[in-house]
């Protein structure tokens, strides 16, 4: 059996996500969940960067375009949040691109508009 990377940190991040879902439920805009998570992360002392640009390169040349994941927590976990009916392959691909363009190995994809419970996936490179 393979080791689960960043087990404790991802557990703490997901705890904050579950709390936001419990308080708000589904149906809000993604930006609302984003703001609520920033508050919840501060309350739980979870270190995070919000919308921090990830630089992109092509053949050693830095691109003007960059990726901006919703959160980078603990300097090692990408958290991408959604407020959609269901998570699609394009959402998973987006998280994988974030990981490929950085040194990070773990991404969490969380959908707050799924009912009756929070939808979430771990994506590991």
Residue ranges: model-predicted function:
Residues 1-47, 123-125:
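Solvent-exposed, charged helical/coil patches
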Residues 25, 69-87, 98:
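Conserved catalytic cores of phosphodiester-cleaving nucleases, focusing on short active-site segments
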Residues 42-59:
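A short acidic/basic microdomain associated with nuclease active sites
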Residues 82-125:
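Nucleic-acid nuclease catalytic cores
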């Amino acid at each position: 059996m393979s080791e689960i990377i960043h087990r404790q940190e991802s557990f703490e991040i997901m705890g904050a996500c579950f709390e936001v879902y419990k308080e708000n439920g589904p149906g809000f805009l993604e930006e609302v969940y984003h703001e609520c998570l920033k508050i919840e992360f501060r309350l739980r002392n979870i270190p995070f960067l919000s919308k921090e640009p990830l630089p992109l390169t092509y053949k050693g040349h830095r691109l003007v375009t960059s990726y901006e994941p919703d959160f980078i927590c603990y300097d090692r976990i990408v958290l991408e949040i959604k407020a959609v009916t269901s998570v699609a392959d394009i959402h998973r691909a987006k998280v994988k691109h974030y990981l490929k363009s950085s040194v990070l190995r773990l991404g969490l994809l969380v959908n707050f508009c799924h009912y009756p419970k929070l939808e979430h996936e771990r994506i590991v490179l």
